[in-house]
């Protein structure tokens, strides 16, 4: 292949990539953080969507509880450890997310002795369903 043909092909490839890049600038593409197949989602015609926040001081923990529907937790700061009955503890750190399964006895902890923990919680349920059921 002569120089002119190679140069022309290289120029066309460069031009196409520049056009594609220019079209993508300013366009936000969501990045997948977590995907899980879940059972136990609400099946009614209407659902209530709740977004909650929780702040844990070092050493704080939740009450021993269950949820009627899956709960998604996103960690803003610190590390969250979830202990579920019959399962190994799970720890997720800032920038990560996890799904708490329904109908499993659990408690969540900030195991750090120095760092706070902040989380955002997403809960989709039948309307007026309690967020958690405390285990006594």
Give short role names for the model-derived ranges:
Residues 20-24:
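Boundary at the C-terminal end of the N-terminal hydrophobic targeting segment
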Residues 89, 103-128:
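Ligand-binding loop in jelly-roll beta-barrel domains
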Residues 8-17:
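Bacterial N-terminal signal peptides
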Residues 28-63, 122:
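A short glycine-rich, His/Asp/Glu-containing loop-to-beta-strand
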Residues 69-86, 96:
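Glycine- and acidic-residue-biased ligand/ion/polar-headgroup-sensing regions
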Residues 56, 86-103:
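Short acidic-glycine-tyrosine-enriched beta hairpin
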Residues 61-63, 81, 98, 102-109, ...:
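Histidine-centered metal-chelating micro-motifs
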Residues 1-9:
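Bacterial N-terminal signal peptides that target proteins for export
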